[in-house]
């Protein structure tokens, strides 16, 4: 399709034949970059269906922060990466002048508070609070036909170092007090 890839400023076009010269074995195969772009576009289209509507309030609880896996994932959730890619595509549709002024790298843009994100297993997070305020036990392992899957949560917390104790960035400390705090959110999980 039209558009850019996940790597800003890089757009690979054509197929393996045009990229690597004529070769009967690769004739007609699309490039890996074009295939990747197509898969991302399909996932973004599917994500649009999941977006909450006024009629479906349960969709508000949809979250990519919970995963069932045989081991703790090493990378952030796919939907976070898709959101970053979608934001890049949205920025690519702006005019060059607007994009130049909104590009974080050009303005030295920083987060208001430093944070760290990591996967935490249910073995480390044994209890949680449900939407009615009751404390519930989090299911650590889920039995499946070929063994067990562990339940893992992707948590983002305020960083213990940096500006958390000194207040938030961009706040005039002469007139305002500020504090970075980790907030709680609800996700769908097995309890």
UniProtKB/Swiss-Prot annotation:
<feature type="propeptide">
    <location>
        <begin position="1"/>
        <end position="100"/>
    </location>
</feature>
<dbReference type="GO" id="GO:0008021">
    <property type="term" value="C:synaptic vesicle"/>
</dbReference>
<dbReference type="InterPro" id="IPR019846">
    <property type="entry name" value="Nerve_growth_factor_CS"/>
</dbReference>
<dbReference type="GO" id="GO:0008083">
    <property type="term" value="F:growth factor activity"/>
</dbReference>
<dbReference type="Pfam" id="PF00243">
    <property type="entry name" value="NGF"/>
</dbReference>
<keyword id="KW-1015">Disulfide bond</keyword>
<dbReference type="InterPro" id="IPR002072">
    <property type="entry name" value="Nerve_growth_factor-rel"/>
</dbReference>
<dbReference type="InterPro" id="IPR020430">
    <property type="entry name" value="Brain-der_neurotrophic_factor"/>
</dbReference>
<feature type="region of interest" description="Disordered">
    <location>
        <begin position="1"/>
        <end position="23"/>
    </location>
</feature>
<dbReference type="GO" id="GO:0048812">
    <property type="term" value="P:neuron projection morphogenesis"/>
</dbReference>
<feature type="disulfide bond">
    <location>
        <begin position="113"/>
        <end position="180"/>
    </location>
</feature>
<dbReference type="InterPro" id="IPR029034">
    <property type="entry name" value="Cystine-knot_cytokine"/>
</dbReference>
<keyword id="KW-0339">Growth factor</keyword>
<dbReference type="GO" id="GO:0005163">
    <property type="term" value="F:nerve growth factor receptor binding"/>
</dbReference>
<dbReference type="GO" id="GO:0038180">
    <property type="term" value="P:nerve growth factor signaling pathway"/>
</dbReference>
<comment type="similarity">
    <text>Belongs to the NGF-beta family.</text>
</comment>
<dbReference type="GO" id="GO:0043524">
    <property type="term" value="P:negative regulation of neuron apoptotic process"/>
</dbReference>
<dbReference type="GO" id="GO:0050804">
    <property type="term" value="P:modulation of chemical synaptic transmission"/>
</dbReference>
<dbReference type="GO" id="GO:0030425">
    <property type="term" value="C:dendrite"/>
</dbReference>
<dbReference type="GO" id="GO:0030424">
    <property type="term" value="C:axon"/>
</dbReference>
<protein>
    <recommendedName>
        <fullName>Neurotrophic factor BDNF precursor form</fullName>
    </recommendedName>
</protein>
<keyword id="KW-0964">Secreted</keyword>
<dbReference type="GO" id="GO:0021675">
    <property type="term" value="P:nerve development"/>
</dbReference>
<comment type="function">
    <text>Promotes the survival of neuronal populations that are all located either in the central nervous system or directly connected to it.</text>
</comment>
<dbReference type="GO" id="GO:0005615">
    <property type="term" value="C:extracellular space"/>
</dbReference>
<feature type="glycosylation site" description="N-linked (GlcNAc...) asparagine">
    <location>
        <position position="93"/>
    </location>
</feature>
<dbReference type="InterPro" id="IPR020408">
    <property type="entry name" value="Nerve_growth_factor-like"/>
</dbReference>
<keyword id="KW-0325">Glycoprotein</keyword>
<keyword id="KW-0165">Cleavage on pair of basic residues</keyword>
<dbReference type="GO" id="GO:0007169">
    <property type="term" value="P:cell surface receptor protein tyrosine kinase signaling pathway"/>
</dbReference>
């Amino acid at each position: 399709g039209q558009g850019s890839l996940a790597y800003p400023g890089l757009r690979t076009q054509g197929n393996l034949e045009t990229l690597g010269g004529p070769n009967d074995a690769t004739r007609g195969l699309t490039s890996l970059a074009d295939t990747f772009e197509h898969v991302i576009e399909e996932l973004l289209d599917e994500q649009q269906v999941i977006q909450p509507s006024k009629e479906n309030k349960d969709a508000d609880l949809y979250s990519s922060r919970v995963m069932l896996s045989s081991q703790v994932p090493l990378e952030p959730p796919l939907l976070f990466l898709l959101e970053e890619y979608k934001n890049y595509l949205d920025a690519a549709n702006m005019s060059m002048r607007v994009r130049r002024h909104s590009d974080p790298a050009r303005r030295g843009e920083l987060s208001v508070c430093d944070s760290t994100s990591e996967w935490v297993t249910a073995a480390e997070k044994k209890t949680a609070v449900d939407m009615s305020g009751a404390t519930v036990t989090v299911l650590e392992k889920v039995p499946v036909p070929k063994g067990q899957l562990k339940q893992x949560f992707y948590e983002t917390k305020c960083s213990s170092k940096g500006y958390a104790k000194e207040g938030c960035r961009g706040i005039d400390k002469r007139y305002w007090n500020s504090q970075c705090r980790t907030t709680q959110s609800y996700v769908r999980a097995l309890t």
